[in-house]
Every structure is written in structure tokens, then in C-alpha cells.
Design a protein with these regions (language model features):
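ATP-binding N-terminal substructure of ATP-dependent carboxylate-amine bond-forming enzymes
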Residues: 1-109, 143-147, 397-402
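Active-site nucleotide/adenylate-binding loops and adjacent lid/helix of ATP-dependent enzymes
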Residues: 116-207
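Phosphate-binding site of ATP-dependent enzymes
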Residues: 184-246, 259-266, 287, 293-295
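Flexible, glycine/charged-enriched surface loops at secondary-structure junctions
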Residues: 207, 280-282, 331-335
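Glycine-rich phosphate/pyrophosphate-binding beta-alpha loops
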Residues: 242-245, 249-253, 300-314
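Oxyanion-binding "anion nests"
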Residues: 247-250, 258-283
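Conserved metal-phosphate-binding beta-hairpin within the catalytic cores
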Residues: 272-308
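Peripheral (often C-terminal) accessory segments that flank ATP-dependent C-N-forming ligase machineries
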Residues: 323-411
Length: 411
């Protein structure tokens, strides 16, 4: 007799580990984790079986490799649930979904919808159509990168991003000063960066935006799950209280407080339903103190890297997936209103770099949830390796931190 389901997780980062942990906590199952390379976040873990496939993230390798895995696993399991943990795995999965001939039980958005939101400029067109706010934005091609800085319709400071910082092309290009997101207070600093970028062969568009006032605690993040009929079954809002600043992870969230906002939930829920969204989604946005409105930055067609904050509030996102797809028993609709703390950094870093004293009092009064430290998976080898990386973050913040409200870096 076949078992009910097998989760197949694509990736090996913190998001992948958190996803495996969620399946373990909810169903005591052992997922299969498939990746091209194993990262520290998933090292020495007992939670999953591991399959390392050379060049698995390559367009020419991925379809056949995953199909072979699916064919093998379907002999033992009724339902195969595939959860991609990066944008490029999601993109590969969506483009080749029909090739897997129904072997994947869960559904994803269509290639057409993915193409309409996989870069920030396309996403903003959807936002405009559906009544969501977004920042003043200029999009430039590689040939326009240098001259566009003298034609901006808004003043410095500015924020600059690749059209998709998680796209394969940007992840694999190299140049001095490369980051996921850039903050500039002057023209020459911007030109220094783009001239270095122009030597890398990166041919994607650049997104140049007005800086919305506010520090890390003005940011907001929302993770969602929608069923095959585009009904939002789960929404959870978070208030980041600290971001990362080192070049490799700048803009990622280091700590989050879970929140609730009924009006925002209603707007996002309507947006997802109107565009026909299916599966997991992650929104990044910022609260604009001048207008009192939320300004959308981007949507990722998967759970966010820091999505384990949802678990801190008492909700398990994988339970919504499994109960929907396998057991047809998912709750009709859940929106979080619980306040809880998730952190990926030591408390000493929060005490030093969280400037809002009211927030600091709030976070020090709450228990903390951490993705990578799980009582059910703490071998000595894992604890040493993950713990070393965890404590090394003190050095990263000391070297790279700056106050976004008062001290933009001169790069």
C-alpha cells in the first residue's frame, strides 16, 4: 500500500531547511531534498534524504533529472508534493510543469502569470491595474545605465536593484561591489557601481526607485498560500525589525515580528484572487509614513527565505499545502493576528542595531523562534557548523551596518 505523500524540496538553503522542518513538525515525514550543492543551513541534518544532482539548476539538466526522481518516487507514494525554495527553481518548475504528466500533485501559477510578475517592472503594472501602491520607478536597459542617472524624475537618495536579484543570470555574474540591493546618496557612487556591473556581462534591466523614508522596521513582508481555485487560505504579515547588510544578503530579513492588518489582508487577498494566483507567495513592501499606505516592492512566487516567521506565530504553511492537496481539509481562510518573534541573528545583535526603543522592549519580552536550531535535529556536528555561522554574524553587522535613515553608504 502506498504512503499518502512525499514532499520533494528543491534547494538547500535556510528556506529549504525550514520547509523540511515544517513537514517534520506537522506530519513526522522525511522529505527528499534535491539540490545542486548542499549549503551549511542543511548540513548534518536528520530531517530529510538528500539527492545532490550536478547542475540541477541548469535548464538542460533540471527537467529530466526531476522527472526521473518523480517516476521513481511515485511507485511508493500516492502524492508527490514539490516545493521550490528559490525563484529559479520555481521558474524551471513552472516552465516544465506539463512535462511531468500529472506526477506532481500540487499546482503552480501559469507560465503566463509568472512572466507578468517575475520582474519588478512587470509586477508594478499588475499593481497599477489592481490598485496597489508602488514606488516611483525608472527601468533602464544595459545601454541606458549610465545616462539615466541624469534623467531621474525624483531626487537622491535612491534605491537600485536588478530586475530580479534572484534570477540565475544575476546570481552567477561577478563584479566588484555586487549586492542584491544598492542605496545611493550621490551620482558618482551610482556610476562607480554600474561601470563595474557593465564589465560582468549582466544584461538584465536595472530598477531605480525613490527611497521611501524609514528604516528596517518600516518594511513589511507577507507570505500567503492560495489553493487551485486562487482562494487565499493563509496570509501572515510580518514587520522586519532588522535586515542584513553584507553584500551577499543585503535586503534579506534578519528578524521579524508577526503582525496583523485586516485592511492589508483584504487588499492582498483580493489581488491574489483577481490575478488567478496558485500556491505560495511572498510579498515585500514598505509602510510609507507620508501617505499612511503600504508600497509594494516585489512578489516572489514561493515562500520567502525568512518565511519561518509564520511558524513563530503558530501557523505551519506546509499544513495548508498538505491539507489542501492531499486531504482536502484545509481551513477556509486564516489571517494571522498573533504577535511573535522570529530571528536569525543572536539577541546581542538585535539589542545593538534595533534603534526603536519601543520595538526593542517588545522583542526582549517575547520568546524567539529560530529556523535552524530545532530540538529534533541537533547533532553535535550540526550544532557546531550552524552555530559557528550564527555567531559569525556579529562581524558582518559590525563591518557593513549603516542607518538607512541617516547614513547612506558612499560606495
Amino acid at each position: 500500500m502506498k504512503k499518502d505523500f512525499l514532499p520533494i524540496i528543491l534547494g538547500s538553503d535556510e528556506n529549504a531547511y525550514g520547509t523540511a522542518r515544517l513537514f517534520h513538525e506537522a506530519y513526522d515525514v522525511r522529505p527528499l531534498l534535491v539540490c545542486a550543492h548542499q549549503l551549511i543551513a542543511t548540513s548534518h541534518s536528520r530531517l530529510f534524504d538528500l539527492s545532490i544532482v550536478k547542475n540541477f539548476d541548469d535548464e538542460d539538466v533540471f527537467p529530466n533529472a526531476l522527472d526521473n526522481i518523480l517516476r521513481r518516487c511515485q511507485e511508493e507514494y500516492e502524492n508527490l508534493l514539490v516545493v521550490p525554495c528559490s525563484d529559479y527553481y520555481t521558474s524551471l518548475l513552472v516552465r516544465h510543469y506539463d512535462r511531468f504528466d500529472g506526477r506532481i500533485a500540487n499546482r503552480f501559477i501559469s507560465p503566463e502569470l509568472l512572466a507578468s510578475l517575475d520582474t519588478k517592472d512587470k509586477f508594478y503594472k499588475l499593481c497599477e491595474k489592481h490598485g496597489l501602491d508602488f514606488p516611483k520607478t525608472v527601468v533602464c536597459t544595459p545601454d541606458e545605465r549610465e545616462r539615466v542617472i541624469d534623467e531621474l524624475p525624483f531626487p537622491f537618495p535612491i534605491v537600485v536593484k536588478p530586475e530580479n536579484s534572484n534570477a540565475h543570470e544575476y546570481l552567477h555574474c561577478e563584479f566588484e561591489g555586487k549586492q542584491k540591493v544598492y542605496f545611493f546618496s550621490e551620482r558618482e557612487a551610482y556610476l562607480t557601481m554600474v561601470r563595474a556591473m557593465n564589465t560582468s556581462g549582466y544584461r538584465g534591466k536595472l530598477i531605480i526607485q525613490e527611497f521611501i523614508e524609514g528604516g528596517d522596521d518600516a518594511m513589511r513582508v507577507m507570505n500567503a498560500y492560495c489553493d487551485v481555485n486562487s482562494r487565499a487560505r493563509m496570509l501572515c504579515l510580518g514587520q522586519p525589525i532588522l535586515e542584513y547588510y553584507d553584500p551577499a544578503t543585503a535586503g534579506n530579513y534578519a528578524a521579524i515580528l508577526t503582525r496583523g492588518d485586516d485592511e492589508l489582508y483584504t487588499r492582498v487577498r483580493s489581488f491574489l484572487q483577481e490575478i488567478g494566483y496558485v500556491g505560495f507567495a511572498n510579498f515585500d513592501m514598505k509602510f510609507d509614513r507620508k501617505t499612511g499606505r503600504y508600497v509594494m516592492f516585489e512578489i516572489n512566487p514561493r515562500l520567502g527565505r525568512s518565511s519561518f516567521y509564520v511558524r513563530a506565530a503558530g501557523h505551519n504553511m506546509m499544513r495548508f499545502l498538505v491539507d489542501d492537496v492531499v486531504y482536502d481539509s484545509a481551513p477556509e481562510y486564516v489571517c494571522n493576528k498573533t504577535v511573535a518573534l522570529w530571528s536569525n541573528v543572536p539577541m546581542g545583535i538585535l539589542r545593538r542595531y534595533v534603534k526603536n526603543k519601543a520595538l526593542l522592549r517588545e522583542i526582549t519580552s517575547l520568546p524567539v523562534t529560530r529556523t535552524l536550531f530545532y530540538r529534533g535535529d541537533l547533532s553535535l556536528k550540526r550544532l557546531v557548523r550552524v552555530g559557528k555561522q550564527f555567531l559569525a554574524q556579529y562581524g558582518g553587522f559590525k563591518k557593513y551596518y549603516f542607518d538607512k535613515e541617516t547614513d547612506f553608504p558612499k560606495m
